[in-house]
Amino acid sequence: MGNEFSGVVEEVGNNVDEFSVGDRVYCRMPLDKIGAFAEFAAVNKNALAKIPDYLSFEQAACVPLTALTAYQSFDLMKVKENERIFISGGTGSLGAMAIPIAKNFGLKVITNGSAKNKERVIDLGVDEFIDYRTQDYSEILSDIDYVLDTLGEKELEKEFKILKNDGILVSLKGMPNKEFAERMGLSSIKKVLFGVVGRKFDKIAQKKNQKYYFLFVNENGAQLSQVSKIFEQNKIQPSIDEIFELSEVNKALKKVDNGESKGKTLLKIN
């Protein structure tokens, strides 16, 4: 178990020149080798990146999964400078990463959430904030270039509504579709299966020549290195909720499962 980690390089392979013993590194674990809840992990160099100097190990451990999710979403969209993106529910931990990364891509960022979080996301760079308790974004916004969906199926139709003709929606919690299966190189049977489960949203997108993508984040050291540069330039401060010892792993997992975390919940392995 464990999707991401920060730590120190203890050994390197014979053909590794990019990293040295003692380097501070972080990583989104490869999908076939999830296992960050451990004292040591053997990881392909192509999944690793060096930690920005200003981040502690604890802060760095918060970064890879959510930051890569945001980065890969914008990469999939092929975003262009000065265009508008709506990030649904952008006041959470993903938004805290996605907003400054979106600004680094030159995007104009709109998000919604609770009014108590308005100032915090404005400080992150949001250009327009919508209080979901008093305003319905689907009645306010239109002709949006991109939507990053973090809420899932119950919001997707409203998100398509605000998207311009030929706009692009990337969902992190919707249904995978055939395009996702093809992009991920999945089996023929999964292409058929995902083609069925994602058909509803493909059809909605086709009405206005829009594009619907489902994203499941992959390990990518080169992209994570770009994230490191963005963090270094902007001095982004990851949000930590609580740090547990490895012996408290069940307590930590329960907290996350119950949705009680207001930032990242970490395990510290001594």
Regions found by a protein language model. Give the residues of each.
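C-terminal hydrophobic helical "lid"/dimerization subdomain
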Residues: 217-270
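Glycine-rich beta-strand-centered segment in the early N-terminal region that forms part
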Residues: 1-34
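A short acidic, Gly/Pro-enriched loop at the edge of an enzyme's catalytic core
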Residues: 139-146
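Glycine-rich phosphate-binding loop and adjacent beta-alpha segment
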Residues: 154-233, 269
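NAD(P)H dinucleotide-binding glycine-rich loop of Rossmann-like/cofactor-binding domains
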Residues: 28-89
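Mid-domain Rossmann-like dinucleotide-binding core that forms the NAD(H)/NADP(H) cofactor-binding site
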Residues: 64-134
